[in-house]
């Protein structure tokens, strides 16, 4: 599905082509830029689920050695083009975040900007264990995912992972949670519009009644908020986790 999004193709039969990419905001995430300014990034960096590469390009421009991985070949193609346009060196690659074979003991810092909540329970456990293998002793993992909160009435457009679930997954996989709390994530609302009829039947059948109701609520709120925005950018409620690798 994600590869089709990056190629601008319909993700399901009967669906229109995407009007945009919700996480394409044309820059690094503001909270990541703050983290870097505060000294939270060190050593060899892994940007996992790098998407269009804006975070990786930003960190490389700040002098870090960055490896950026994504499961979508189309995302990596576009990320490489972006890095070349800016003139920075990033090591890009296509990889399964739940495996990471070949990357053992490589990284001191991991940045996850909206990948974690895309995985199911088994996938998140495999992912956390894989990152443990791919990192060095005392590595830090900075994780940003959808939360159950709201920002000025704006809620998550999809179901979030509970804080208890995140705590259990990370601590059972060799990670110590140093901080877990609320934050925000900048999103492109131009890609989040439409009405319920724009959700193809194939996708609707895969969603629970609760998820469909939540999406309808989000769309209703966006109808009110988006006309007030100058640039289609909106902050969504997220959870941030800063975790340390333990052995």
Feature-to-residue mapping (PLM):
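Short catalytic micro-motifs in class I SAM-dependent methyltransferases
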Residues: 114-118
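Class I (Rossmann-like) S-adenosyl-L-methionine-dependent methyltransferase catalytic domain
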Residues: 1-40, 44-46, 52-86, 90-102, ...
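A short acidic, Gly/Pro-enriched loop at the edge of an enzyme's catalytic core
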Residues: 102-110
């Amino acid at each position: 599905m994600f590869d089709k999004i990056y190629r601008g193709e319909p993700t399901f039969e009967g669906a229109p082509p995407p009007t945009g990419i919700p996480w394409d905001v044309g820059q690094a995430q503001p909270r990541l830029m703050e983290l870097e300014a505060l000294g939270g990034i060190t050593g060899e960096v892994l940007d996992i689920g790098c998407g269009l590469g804006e975070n990786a390009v930003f960190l490389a421009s700040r002098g870090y050695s960055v490896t950026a991985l994504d499961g979508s070949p189309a995302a990596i193609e576009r990320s490489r083009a972006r890095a070349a346009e800016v003139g920075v060196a990033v090591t890009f690659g296509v990889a399964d975040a739940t495996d990471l074979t070949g990357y053992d003991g490589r990284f001191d810092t991991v940045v996850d900007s909206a990948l974690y909540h895309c995985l199911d329970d088994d996938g998140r456990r495999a992912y956390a264990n894989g990152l443990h293998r791919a990192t060095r002793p005392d590595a830090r993992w900075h994780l940003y995912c959808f939360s159950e909160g709201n920002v000025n009435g704006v809620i998550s457009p999809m179901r979030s992972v509970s804080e208890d679930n995140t705590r259990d997954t990370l601590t059972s996989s060799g990670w110590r949670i140093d901080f877990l709390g609320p934050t925000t994530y900048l999103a492109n609302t131009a890609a989040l519009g439409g009405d319920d009829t724009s959700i193809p039947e194939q996708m609707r059948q895969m969603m629970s009644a609760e998820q469909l109701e939540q999406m309808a609520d989000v769309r209703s709120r966006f109808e009110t908020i988006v006309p007030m925005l100058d640039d289609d950018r909106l902050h969504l409620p997220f959870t941030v986790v800063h975790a340390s690798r333990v052995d």
